[in-house]
UniProtKB/Swiss-Prot annotation:
Keyword Transferase on entry: no
Protein name stated in the entry: H-2 class I histocompatibility antigen, L-D alpha chain
Single GO biological process annotation from the record: immune response
Highest rank taxon of the organism: Eukaryota
Originating species: Mus musculus
Lineage: Eukaryota, Metazoa, Chordata, Craniata, Vertebrata
Residues recorded with modification Phosphoserine: 353, 356
């Protein structure tokens, strides 16, 4: 790849930006761009997808009936026609850049034009609670493998193989790192703040996690305790296990935070402990939606004996309530009949049961 990846997409819109106030970070913006060659089926397919805080908000697909950037979040619909027309034209320019560099990489790797190949580019930025850049990203991959990436210092490159070394030398001569760093520290951060402002009702909300601990028996006198955090937003969360107040790090299994499918996230952390020692372990949950961190233990279910005692007590209480209701009813009837036994008075024309039985004799 000789030419640097285009950055016009956001640079051309920089004049429209203004400082905004957002909820404490961190927040992120990412663009994932992909081109896939398909010999005999026309030009490579190009797709660009943008995410803010892991939520898709824009998409471009060259295979669409009318290829253009489309909003993928309701809050992006407030952008006017000029915005969409401009970034669509920029996307079509980037589509051409991908096609050219796919052909260039075929030469670098001495590959024929008859196969299917993929070029990917991920770029974006993270900001902290002060609104400033935490980290920037510029990463390229070819055929599913790392190719070249801008290092965290935003000054140097890491090339994955000999072909990528060619690109690294060309980009170093062209000052590409300075070019990308200026974008990441400037326009990327500013556009992220703008999008956070536009989508504040969705992106700046906080949903506190619902947490609990589950118990999973193992062999050899051990059990797994798993601490669950469900239904939280934003995605940033910390789960830790402690033994008698001391944090466990090496012995803890932690899964990546993953979307729940309803706009919230979920995560769990587990630890293997000796059977019978479960109460010595606590799970701590940290999330900005919580007024203070949660501390949880595994709560064993009631034993069979305890359950029977509870059932017996509830049965006695229920019986006492029924007896009390009957006594109250009888006392009330006695008061209503002047205390003469509380017998029911027969209505005019009615017959007692004894009379009816006599009348029915054969």
């Amino acid at each position: 790849m000789g030419a640097m990846a285009p950055r016009t997409l956001l640079l051309l819109l920089a004049a429209a930006l203004a400082p905004t106030q957002t909820r404490a970070g961190p927040h992120s913006m990412r663009y994932f761009e992909t081109a896939v060659s398909r010999p005999g089926l026309g030009e490579p397919r190009y797709i660009s997808v943008g995410y803010v805080d892991n939520k898709e908000f824009v998409r471009f697909d060259s295979d669409a009936e009318n290829p253009r950037y489309e909003p993928q979040a309701p809050w992006m619909e407030q952008e006017g026609p000029e915005y969409w027309e401009r970034i669509t034209q920029i996307a079509k320019g980037q589509e051409q850049w991908f096609r050219v560099n796919l052909r260039t990489l075929l030469g670098y790797y001495n590959q024929s034009a008859g196969g299917t190949h993929t070029l990917q580019w991920m770029y974006g930025c993270d900001v902290g609670s002060d609104g400033r850049l935490l980290r920037g990203y510029e990463q390229f991959a070819y055929d599913g493998c790392d190719y070249i990436a801008l290092n965290e210092d935003l000054k140097t490159w890491t090339a994955a193989d000999m072909a990528a070394q060619i690109t690294r030398r060309k980009w170093e001569q062209a000052g590409a790192a300075e070019y990308y760093r200026a974008y990441l520290e400037g326009e990327c951060v500013e556009w992220l703040h703008r999008y956070l402002k536009n989508g504040n009702a969705t992106l700046l909300r906080t949903d506190s996690p619902k947490a609990h601990v589950t118990h999973h028996p193992r062999s050899k006198g051990e059990v797994t305790l798993r601490c669950w955090a469900l239904g939280f937003y934003p995605a940033d969360i910390t789960l830790t296990w402690q033994l008698n107040g001391e944090e466990l790090t090496q012995d803890m299994e932690l899964v990546e935070t993953r979307p729940a499918g309803d706009g919230t996230f979920q995560k769990w952390a587990s630890v293997v402990v000796p059977l019978g020692k479960e109460q010595n372990y606590t799970c701590r949950v940290y999330h900005e939606g919580l007024p203070e961190p949660l501390t949880l233990r595994w709560e064993p279910p009631p034993s069979t004996d305890s359950y029977m005692v509870i059932v017996a007590v509830l049965g006695v209480l229920g019986a006492m309530a029924i007896i009390g209701a009957v006594v109250a009813f009888v006392m009330k009837r006695r008061r209503n009949t002047g205390g003469k036994g509380g017998d029911y008075a027969l209505a005019p024309g009615s017959q007692s049961s004894e009379m009816s039985l006599r009348d029915c004799k054969a």
